[in-house]
Swiss-Prot record:
NCBIfam families, A to Z: PRK00665.1
Species whose genome carries this gene: Prochlorococcus marinus (strain SARG / CCMP1375 / SS120)
UniProt key word Calcium: no
Function in brief: Component of the cytochrome b6-f complex, which mediates electron transfer between photosystem II (PSII) and photosystem I (PSI), cyclic electron flow around PSI, and state transitions. PetG is required for either the stability or assembly of the cytochrome b6-f complex.
Keyword Cell wall biogenesis/degradation appears in the UniProt entry: no
Domain of life: Bacteria
Name listed for the protein in its UniProt record: Cytochrome b6-f complex subunit 5
Similarity-based family: Belongs to the PetG family.
Subcellular location: Cellular thylakoid membrane
Keywords, ordered alphabetically: Electron transport, Membrane, Photosynthesis, Thylakoid, Transmembrane, Transmembrane helix, Transport
Length: 39
């Protein structure tokens, strides 16, 4: 049985981690695809 505290930490960290990875990937994609188009 998973402890409530551990479950709460996981449920709290997972969305933040996914959001951080998504933002980082989006920034890299936008920087890698948009700048050559402007040049």
């Amino acid at each position: 049985m998973i402890e409530p505290l551990l479950c709460g930490i996981v449920l709290g960290l997972v969305p933040i981690t996914l959001l951080g990875l998504f933002v980082a990937a989006w920034n890299q994609y936008r920087r890698g695809s948009a700048i050559p188009d402007w040049e």
